[in-house]
């Protein structure tokens, strides 16, 4: 892309605006190199990156760029062995923190389901160096000072320094407090000169003080003297400071060597963060100018919806629809000067450059932009009627260069084509130049104020006339582009509104040819028709958007209602499960009481059995149905005791015990017995053989209540198998469909013994080892008949 074209379209000013949104000097540096690309794949990727960054800004506000500084100089110095300063290590630590924060921030958003694959891909390249960050932070604080605990040696030296400084100050302050010394001192303070502690002594008392003069006041009236009594103490202090400096140098050298080991990773982190800053700056700019992602193509088709020039004040800029490259490849905008033609031309050119640079463009959603190999522009300040030959020549030199390079993958912009010479010759040249460029199938937008070009679009296939609307009422252009309507001067209307007498205007019109007047009338009619059509289209579009908004609101309400319904069902099911669990616990407690009574050889009394039965029946909760029960799938039939049924209100299987009269049955569900209405029962299968004694045994005979698991670990072989026999019988009586036997892995002897017993047991339907989550081969899961 030619630099003079970028300058003519003021692309550098757009770059300056984008640079203002960068978070670091690194991002600004990268944006300074921003330029249009001719690779559609690269452009689409950059636009998608900006789109993802815009989503992040919309959802989270900003990405964390704090700590991102340019440390490349420090890293290069570390590579060659130069010792880095504490402040440089503070910057490196800040960068390491920024890397950690950015990686976590973007990774968390991706894990939360935000669709940012390209940004996430950048973040995955970041390398967190926690060890290096910890080493630096343990030695240097946020202000670039080496900490006392950076080493034990440094801690000891600084303790010594503080002690020595305290002694020197105490000695000097005692001198200052001396009554004999007060008249000889300019001030009663201890100060420092040449890194040594001194006191201010008046010039006339110099001989009364032994010691070393380190400085004199500007007036010469005060001498800053180090008394002889503290010279040795100051010397000791200086020696300690030298040791401190040497130890700090050693610590910094060690840190530099550690940093040098990771310069490759740090350079990569810098590059990734620089790229992210580059992307997010473009996204922040897009938000500031209300830009959208254009749809890119390589077919030369442009359709900009409500396009706005990004450098004009938002409250003054006029949005325009611009379409080029499908039904016509050339647009010629005609009309008078100062009508806004150049702004329209620059808007098209600048938005094309922005899109090809991976920037979102100030236009409405759904706008399309094309990728061009070349963008040519001949734009100058041609707003004066008087044009010099030199101006015409310079434009013609530029046009000749364009004609030599233009091809079908070019966008060509001509501003006031043919201006600067005789109007008739200029118009003829303009048409000839347009014909030549049009034959290459390039995309062309040209502006001119020559009336001869009004008919150009009607006589050429693939060429469309256009103009910029002029408001007769306000005597000013509206800057609204009218494609399909050629421009007209409006000179008569303007003159009339400004007070020119009617007879002069009438005489002027008579001087015009009938053909010219007819053309002007036709153009005026076209303008009115187009305006009405646009108003109707705008109204239709408004109705469509309102309908879409209503549709989305209804969809959202449906989603919310479904979500609320699902939540209510889930809560109801959870409450039901909790009630069943509580009922099971109550039943277990009751059976445990009966078992205890039996083991203590107590005889059952009638009232104890009656109370236990009532408690068992009352243990089953009365559910508040949060949803309608299932309807029976089969036709109504005659139930009989022993039938296996499904209790629809609870979704559980059970066995019919006896009919209690009317339409109710006593149903056994596991260890629970309850009354259920016949309409809430669904037949599954008939009873194989009635076992009348089963319920009696369950309460009065066999002690059948057991846990769902039998733990045999630590048991002797024979005792363990005996327990398995008893446990299986009890589990069958308890109505359990499935139990687990924990035998452990060990030598495998107990496991094999259990497996052999289960194969031949009358109540075992099947058995298997537990899954990974059930205990693996250390557990056998038994299905009971």
Curated annotation (Swiss-Prot):
GO molecular function, one term: double-stranded DNA binding
Induction note: Constitutively transcribed in rich and minimal media, highest transcripts occur in stationary phase in minimal media. In rich medium protein is expressed at a constant level during all growth stages (at protein level). Probably part of the polX-mutS2-yshE operon.
Root EC class: hydrolase
Domain Smr stretches: 710-785
Keyword Ribonucleoprotein set for record: no
Compartments (UniProt record): Cytoplasm
Chain intervals for the UniProt region annotation (KOW region): 641-681
Region (Partially complements a deletion for mitomycin C (MMC) resistance and for chromosomal DNA transformation): 636-785
Taxonomy, superkingdom: Bacteria
Ligand binding (ATP): 335-342
Outcome following mutation: residue 416 to A: Probably decreased ATP hydrolysis, more associated with polysomes than disomes or trisomes, does not restore alanine-tailing, does not restore erythromycin sensitivity, prevents disome splitting
Coiled-coil region: 513-586
Impact upon substituting residue 743 to A: Dramatically decreased binding to stalled/collided disomes
PANTHER family with a match to the protein in the record: OS10G0509000 PROTEIN (PTHR48466:SF2), OS10G0509000 PROTEIN-RELATED (PTHR48466)
Known role: Acts as a ribosome collision sensor splitting the ribosome into its 2 subunits. Detects stalled/collided disomes (pairs of ribosomes where the leading ribosome is stalled and a second ribosome has collided with it) which it binds and splits, by an ATP-hydrolysis driven conformational change. Does not seem to have endoribonuclease activity (in the context of ribosome stalling). Does not seem to be involved in mismatch repair or in the prevention of interspecific recombination during DNA transformation. Might be involved in homologous recombination. Putative endonuclease that may be involved in the suppression of homologous recombination and may therefore have a key role in the control of bacterial genetic diversity.
Miscellaneous remark of the record: The ssrA gene (for tmRNA) encodes the SsrA tag added to nascent proteins in stalled ribosomes by trans-translation, which targets the nascent protein for degradation.
Protein name: Putative endonuclease MutS2
Source organism (scientific name): Bacillus subtilis (strain 168)
């Amino acid at each position: 892309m030619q630099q003079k074209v970028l300058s003519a379209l003021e692309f550098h000013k757009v770059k300056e605006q984008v640079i203002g949104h960068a978070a670091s000097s690194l991002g600004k540096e990268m944006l300074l190199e921003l330029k249009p690309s001719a690779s559609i794949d690269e452009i689409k990727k950059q636009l998608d990156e900006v789109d993802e960054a815009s989503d992040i800004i919309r959802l989270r506000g900003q990405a964390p760029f704090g700590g991102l500084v340019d440390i490349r100089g420090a890293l290069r110095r570390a590579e060659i062995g130069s010792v880095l300063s504490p402040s440089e290590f503070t910057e490196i630590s800040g960068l390491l923190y920024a890397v950690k924060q950015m990686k976590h921030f973007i990774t968390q958003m991706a894990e939360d389901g935000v669709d940012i694959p390209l940004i996430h891909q950048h973040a995955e390249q970041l390398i967190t160096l926690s060890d290096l960050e910890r080493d630096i932070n343990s030695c240097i604080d946020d202000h670039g000072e080496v900490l006392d605990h950076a080493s034990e040696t440094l801690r000891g030296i600084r303790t010594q320094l503080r002690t020595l400084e305290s002694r020197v100050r105490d000695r000097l302050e005692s001198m200052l407090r001396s009554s004999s010394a007060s008249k000889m001192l300019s001030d009663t303070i201890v100060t420092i000169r040449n890194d040594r502690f001194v006191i201010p002594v008046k010039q006339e008392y110099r001989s009364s003080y032994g010691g070393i003069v380190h400085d004199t006041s500007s007036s010469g009236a005060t001498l800053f003297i180090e008394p002889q009594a503290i010279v040795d103490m100051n010397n000791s202090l200086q020696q300690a400071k030298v040791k401190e400096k040497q130890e700090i140098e050693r610590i910094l050298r060690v840190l530099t060597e550690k940093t040098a080991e990771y310069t490759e990773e740090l350079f990569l982190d810098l590059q990734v963060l620089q790229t992210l800053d580059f992307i997010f700056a473009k996204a922040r700019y897009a938000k500031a100018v209300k830009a959208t992602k254009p749809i890119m193509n390589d077919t030369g088709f442009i359709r900009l919806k409500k396009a706005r020039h990004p450098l004009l004040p938002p409250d003054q800029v006029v949005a325009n629809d611009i379409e080029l490259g499908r039904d016509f490849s050339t647009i010629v905008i005609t009309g008078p000067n100062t009508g806004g033609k150049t702004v329209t031309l620059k808007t098209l050119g600048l938005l094309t450059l922005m899109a090809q640079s991976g920037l979102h463009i100030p236009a409405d959603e759904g706008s399309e932009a094309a990728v061009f190999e070349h963008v040519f522009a001949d734009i100058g300040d041609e707003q004066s009627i008087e044009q010099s030959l030199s101006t015409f020549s310079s434009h013609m030199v530029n046009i000749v260069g364009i004609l030599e390079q233009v091809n079908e993958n070019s966008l060509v912009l001509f501003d006031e084509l043919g201006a600067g010479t005789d109007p008739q010759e200029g118009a003829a040249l303009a048409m000839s130049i347009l014909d030549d460029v049009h034959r290459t199938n390039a995309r062309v937008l040209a502006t001119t104020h020559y009336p001869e070009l009004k008919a150009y679009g009607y006589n050429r296939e693939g060429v469309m006339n256009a103009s910029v609307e002029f408001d007769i009422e306000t005597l000013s252009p509206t800057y609204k582009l009218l494609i399909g309507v050629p421009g007209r001067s409006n000179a008569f209307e303007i003159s009339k509104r400004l007070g020119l007498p009617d007879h002069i205007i009438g005489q002027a019109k008579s001087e015009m040819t009938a053909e010219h007047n007819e053309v002007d009338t036709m153009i005026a009619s076209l303008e009115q028709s187009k305006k009405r059509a646009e108003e109707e289209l705008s109204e239709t579009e408004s109705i469509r958007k309102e309908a879409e908004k209503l549709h989305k609101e209804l969809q959202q309400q449906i989603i919310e209602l479904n979500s609320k319904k699902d939540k209510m069902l889930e809560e109801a099911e959870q409450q039901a499960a909790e009630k069943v669990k509580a009922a099971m616990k109550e039943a277990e407690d009751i059976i445990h009481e009966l078992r205890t009574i039996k083991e203590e050889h107590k005889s059952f009394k009638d009232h104890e059995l009656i109370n236990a039965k009532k408690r068992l029946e009352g243990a089953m909760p009365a559910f508040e149905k949060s949803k309608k029960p299932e309807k029976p799938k089969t036709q109504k039939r005659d139930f009989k005791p022993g039938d296996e049924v499904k209790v629809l209100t609870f979704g559980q299987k059970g066995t019919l015990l006896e009919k209690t009269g009317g339409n109710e049955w006593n149903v056994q569900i596991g260890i629970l017995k309850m009354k259920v209405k016949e309409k809430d029962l669904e037949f599954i299968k008939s009873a194989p053989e009635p076992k009348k004694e089963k319920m009696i045994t369950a309460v009065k005979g066999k002690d059948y209540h057991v846990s769902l698991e039998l733990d045999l670990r630590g048991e002797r072989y024979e005792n363990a198998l005996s327990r398995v026999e008893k446990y299986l019988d009890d589990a069958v009586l308890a109505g359990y469909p499935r139990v687990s036997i924990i035998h452990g892995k060990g030598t495998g002897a107990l496991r094999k013994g259990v497996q052999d017993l289960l194969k031949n047991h009358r109540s075992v339907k099947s058995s298997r080892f537990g899954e990974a989550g059930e205990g693996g081969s250390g557990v056998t899961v038994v299905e009971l008949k």
